[in-house]
Amino acid sequence: DSVGSTTAHKQQNINHLLDK
C-alpha cells in the first residue's frame, strides 16, 4: 500500500530526528 509506505517513511524520519 502506498499509504503504508508513506507512513513508514515518515515514522522512520521521526525516529531519525529523535535519535539525533
Curated annotation (Swiss-Prot):
Cellular compartment(s): Secreted, Extracellular space
Entry keyword set: Copper, Oxygen transport, Secreted, Transport
GO cellular component terms attached to this protein's record: extracellular region
Main location: secreted
Chain positions covered by the region annotation Disordered: 1-20
Tissue: Hemolymph.
SS bonds (residue pairs): none
Assembly and interaction partners: Composed of 3 major subunits (IB, II and III) and 1 minor subunit (IA) which form homohexamers and heterohexamers. May also form larger structures.
Role of this protein: Hemocyanins are copper-containing oxygen carriers occurring freely dissolved in the hemolymph of many mollusks and arthropods.
Protein name: Hemocyanin subunit Ib
